[in-house]
Amino acid sequence: MPWIQLKLNTTGANAEELSDALMEAGAVSITFQDTHDTPVFEPLPGETRLWGDTDVIGLFDAETDMKDVVAILEQHPLLGAGFAHKIEQLEDKDWEREWMDNFHPMRFGERLWICPSWRDIPDENAVNVMLDPGLAFGTGTHPTTSLCLQWLDGLDLNGKTVIDFGCGSGILAIAALKLGAAKAIGIDIDPQAIQASRDNAERNGVSDRLELYLPKDQPEAMKADVVVANILAGPLRELAPLISVLPVEGGLLGLSGILASQAESICDAYAELFTLDPVVEKEEWCRITGRKK
């Protein structure tokens, strides 16, 4: 069915209050969008991550009298008479089908493909990870995930143990297992991420080789041949003492979730214990890799 969309711009601090106002005026759903397309990473459980400059979009039934809606909103103290807004008629579409059509199999490196379940596998002889978009976790579309997948694809992981620190969807741990790792360990602070990783591992037939832990439950003295952490620069810097002890001597470390402008400070945090490779950049993001001394 067709819909009517009303969009208004506000600050992150006021966005949720105005979303309530739109719902009270008859909106059936609310969407928050960043006006400047700033990337958002995995929010904490229960957190709504908003931006400084936020578009609040209310979706209304096509039969709604939008003059009445605007009149109601003009009474709100954050808006007032003549508040800036945009009303748009949305054509009738199969929105679920359109959403699905936006996701295609993606290749990383020489062997690895990430494929949505509703798409045909492009190469039956390749290493194929079946992963559907859903929860707010990595599916390979973000440059940092892509950088990590390409790195893993280029390693000889046969018989190795891999730790995915901040596992999210489990995409990196599952890819490592499909690429030949004997065992993978996923760690995340979010119980939803642990569940998403478990579900995705079962879908890919590797759940028997994947261990998943919240930080409070992870084994002491845990070690791995390869450690990958695709989180953010702040946690990578703060957790450097913890992450640095995870690789065995001579083991490999891969870090991403880092803006190119942050690379130097992250390198400084790990240089004492690792021989670091040249930084690899993709768009505005980068990957830092090295070997444990």
Curated annotation (Swiss-Prot):
GO terms for molecular function: protein-lysine N-methyltransferase activity. One of its GO terms (cellular component) is cytosol. S-adenosyl-L-methionine binds at residues 145, 166, 188, 230. It catalyses: L-lysyl-[protein] + 3 S-adenosyl-L-methionine = N(6),N(6),N(6)-trimethyl-L-lysyl-[protein] + 3 S-adenosyl-L-homocysteine + 3 H(+). It is found in: Cytoplasm. Its main location: cytoplasm. Its EC number is 2.1.1.-. GO terms for biological process: methylation. Pfam families: PrmA (PF06325). Keywords: Cytoplasm, Methyltransferase, S-adenosyl-L-methionine, Transferase. Belongs to the methyltransferase superfamily. PrmA family. PANTHER family: ELECTRON TRANSFER FLAVOPROTEIN BETA SUBUNIT LYSINE METHYLTRANSFERASE. HAMAP family: Methyltr_PrmA. Methylates ribosomal protein L11. This is Ribosomal protein L11 methyltransferase.
